[in-house]
Amino acid sequence: MSFYNHKEIEPKWQEFWAKNHTFKTGTDAEKPNFYALDMFPYPSGAGLHVGHPEGYTATDILSRYKRAQGYNVLHPMGWDAFGLPAEQYAMDTGNDPADFTAENIANFKRQINALGFSYDWDREVNTTDPNYYKWTQWIFTKLYEKGLAYEAEVPVNWVEELGTAIANEEVLPDGTSERGGYPVVRKPMRQWMLKITAYAERLLNDLEEVDWPESIKDMQRNWIGKSTGANVTFKIKDTDKDFTVFTTRPDTLFGATYAVLAPEHDLVDSITSAEQAEAVAEYKRQASLKSDLARTDLATDKTGVWTGAYAINPVNGKEIPIWIADYVLASYGTGAIMAVPAHDERDWEFAKQFGLDIIPVLEGGNVEEAPYTEDGAHINSDFLDGLNKEEAIAKMVAWLEENGVGQEKISYRLRDWLFSRQRYWGEPIPIIHWEDGTSTAVPENELPLVLPKTSDIKPSGTGESPLANLTDWLEVVREDGVKGRRETNTMPQWAGSSWYYLRYIDPHNDEKLADEDLLKAWLPVDIYIGGAEHAVLHLLYARFWHKFLYDLGVVPTKEPFQKLFNQGMILGTSYRDSRGALVATDKVEKRDGSFFHMETGEELEQAPAKMSKSLKNVVNPDDVVEQFGADTLRVYEMFMGPLDASIAWSEEGLEGSRKFLDRVYRLLTTKELVAENSGALDKVYNETVKTVTEHIEDLKFNTAIAQLMIFVNAANKEDKLYVDYAKGFVQLIAPFAPHLAEELWQGLANTGQSISYVAWPTYDESKLVESEVEIVVQIKGKVKARLTVAKDLAPAELEKVALADEKVQAEIAGQTVVKVISVPNKLVNIVVK
């Protein structure tokens, strides 16, 4: 029996594509352009897992489809290769992170090529290549020139075990680091910051212009966190000092019964009374050990200490105590809040815990029992009494401005981006600090500032990066004899990934980041597919840099990615015992359809779970390609379910996809192909072209494959196959199973050319309609025959056809036909006696 011999066919076509540069990006000015982008991977030592190809296959299907539709297609791949794991490996083994990275890239590339993706490898980029990061550094120098890159003494999330500070986004809810799970402490350090806040409003508004999942847009909106309210100034009793709070509800100011400052607030030490000094100092120390996430966790008990000082509520002159509490962050808002415990859950809990006043200023609820957080008419609020929320806010803001104690203010949750890392394996920041106190950017003609090779890459221990140990590189002298020291911090991994999609457009340009005309031709990216875990950070950072480059006149569009799609997660299988503990797959055996612990014999429950090394349930694509073939893996991952759903990996599903490809191979290599169309497959073929085309456009790959299966089933029922339909079908399956399609195409067309650029099939609308229908013939109410007749046949004609049928004649022999009821396109009912 003939079958698809993947071990022979797949390497053959991969070699053909590489040799012929089949997927070189088209540059025909007459054709439209299509840019399909994958989130490029970090080349880890573990290599690809089966989750990677899901997104890659989706963009590959679109790329192959668009080439066949006559587009120039840009479909590139590269490597996000700076980052902590390579550095950690180098520290553990004494090897150079560059060598480790190069080996990993070679392995990733081998695996990717084995899956038949149609990348244009002439455009490969690597963020650790000096010819690439020259332009990462160039962008930084431009940010610096425009005042958007600046140094500040900021409390950072310091991870002792990693020897570096990490961004807020890299701290887990339990207060440990995302990488390694190490404790995170807050400590002030000199850091480079990027002023992403200058773009907050545009980052928010321009989300309206892109075709992204609403859930991702919402995550970005929440991260930017725009709120309109007022800044209110509180004077501190018996001093000339004051502080400002931002509130979205200035109308509740009459209910403010205490104020809270962040433990790090500048005023804390100077306003604390002698009696409270010790308690305040100890509380500040404890707060410094917690991450922002741990501090703001709503589920934890509130803690705080009174400073001994009082503020004056500007609206009624009342003295209110000033506390410090770690749920107020110095980095958020003004680092100070006014507390209205009657109408805010956190303030209410705090007030109850420490016996502070609770004064209701909105009607409704019993604030002794619980805070009232709904809207209501104002009470206990002097000139606001009886007003609703909108009226009261407007009136209070006017009062604050009139009395010089506040003004309307728009605030954002978004903070400036902490851009420095105290590590070796990253882009050097191209800044020199001179002994006269000035700093300058490295001039453009001296870029790239190359990362020096060194075997000593342990953190310096001083909070500086290992580059601080490299004196020859570190120390420089200006022409006028002034000595300087290079910046020792390096950029975060996010830097290179914030603009890589631009370099793919013109990867070998030595003169500029990319040519303007080429950027105009290819931007914005038509489709960007990757994991939802990058919803906020990578996408927000890339949008920020893109907008900055737009302002410089470097890029022609306001947004980088027109359409974004997040593929779901491919889950592994996990097993749990009766206590709910997870059992590694190599300790599990299957008996009679159930699963048992090999050592204890206990029956286990099977459930999907994220693939992980510890559970030993990670599936390696190399093994799948070896056993089933790359086309099977591609078809299976697209057929598992909707592209954005998270679905459990299944060996049975893989086998099913393999059987389907074998059936396709058999159909097209053993069925007699004829030049004359019998018309039997007209409807199903045209339906298949229509459905597959529309569903590829809509990224509904699972239902496109289901339609291909319907065609194969229908074609197998016929004795012969019309050759044009055979060719059309092979073209339709080519984006999903390209190796198989190339092989079958040579059998059909025998041109020696790839199927990749053969024009995509079209369908005939008129053939989508049935010209014949099946009707049933009933005698005495029972179905005795099924007949195929012309559609819309008149009742009298229908009756003739039914009565002439042999089966029907045999059934009514010797009986009298009393009446015949004919319903066109449905049935003929014969009444006999």
Swiss-Prot record:
Gene3D superfamilies (alphabetical): HUPs, Isoleucyl-tRNA Synthetase, Domain 1, Valyl/Leucyl/Isoleucyl-tRNA synthetase, editing domain
Cited InterPro entries: aa-tRNA-synth_I_CS (IPR001412), aa-tRNA-synth_Ia (IPR002300), Leu-tRNA-ligase (IPR002302), Leu_tRNA-synth_edit (IPR025709), M/V/L/I-tRNA-synth_anticd-bd (IPR013155), Methionyl/Leucyl_tRNA_Synth (IPR015413), Rossmann-like_a/b/a_fold (IPR014729), tRNAsynth_Ia_anticodon-bd (IPR009080)
Span of the annotated motif 'HIGH' region: 41-52
GO molecular function per UniProt: aminoacyl-tRNA deacylase activity; ATP binding; leucine-tRNA ligase activity
Keywords: Aminoacyl-tRNA synthetase, ATP-binding, Cytoplasm, Ligase, Nucleotide-binding, Protein biosynthesis
Motif ('KMSKS' region): 610-614
Full protein name: Leucine--tRNA ligase
Taxonomic source organism: Streptococcus suis (strain 05ZYH33)
Gene responsible for this protein: leuS
